[in-house]
Amino acid sequence: MTFQTIDRPEGRVAYSVDGRADAPLVVLVPGMGDLRSTWRDLAAALTAAGYRVAATDLRGHGDSDTTFSEHGDVATAGDVLALVEHLGGPAVLVGNSMGAGAAAWAAAERPDLVAGLVLTGPFLRDPTLSRAGRAIIRASYTALFARPWGARVWARYYGGTLSKGRHATWHDEHVAALRDAMSDAAHLRQFRLLCRQLTHAPVEARVGQVQTPALAFVGRLDPDFSDPVAEGAWIGEAIGAEVVMVDDVAHYPQHQAPDVVVPATLAFLEGLPRGESGAWPAGARA
């Protein structure tokens, strides 16, 4: 897949873009340890529907540089906002997992650049754990994702536990691509650094400032939430989102259930306000 890059402090972030330059912009943001190809089904449908679609890799992931010292929701949100400005926003932001948290933070920070949110498996707050519990998890990530076994462990966890339920026809291909990407020492090092730094507390602190229309998909089998239904209800209340609970799906509704995510997303986008040119109107800057 061909890609371009945008310069950021400490390195370049990779993205691919398709669709007419004057079409309404949609930016797709993957989650931790994932690649922009996670949006394969949704990106194709959005482009076919007439949208301009940009899919980005996270810092240190995929085709992005592996030179970053700062990772997480806020850093990712800054990268996404820079990309929206570079491509000529506003844009609808579509994010998975921590990418969803970054999208929500971006909407609070720059409502003039964010016309809507579509979130899958959204992390908008940290799980309820003690400080000691969080420290143990971070330490375990450091050990589990070390060389030479780290790429294999992550691929197995992504392809198994985090993808419980139904799978895309290209599931095995995607998991193999993740393992190949993480087999590179620099990429795996960046992934471990992200695991150690990641917190969604900055997002939770700003959910009350998110005013843009939002749609969220939560898998009923998502192991990242102790009670996915309760988490979905909290997300709906916190940001005023329409929440779709997806059966037989875990953390990746975008490729586990495209038959649910694609039509609902297209309907959501169709219902958003448009300017005279058909593009998203700019909101007020915070």
Stretch-by-stretch model annotation:
Residues P30-M32, G95-A100:
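Conserved alpha/beta-hydrolase "nucleophile elbow" surrounding the catalytic nucleophile
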Residues V249-V262:
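Catalytic histidine-centered segment of alpha/beta-hydrolase-like enzymes
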Residues T128-S130, P148-G208:
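Conserved alpha/beta-hydrolase catalytic His-Asp/Glu region
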Residues V17-D63:
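Conserved HGGG/HGGXW glycine-rich cap/lid loop of the alpha/beta-hydrolase fold
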Residues A108, A115-A146:
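Flexible "cap/lid" loop of the alpha/beta hydrolase fold
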Residues M1-V26, A48-Y51, G88, A115, ...:
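Alpha/beta-hydrolase fold catalytic core
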Residues Q211-V249:
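Conserved loop-alpha-helix segment in the C-terminal half of the alpha/beta-hydrolase fold
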Residues S16, A48, R52-V94, M98, ...:
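Active-site loop/oxyanion-hole signature of alpha/beta-hydrolase fold enzymes
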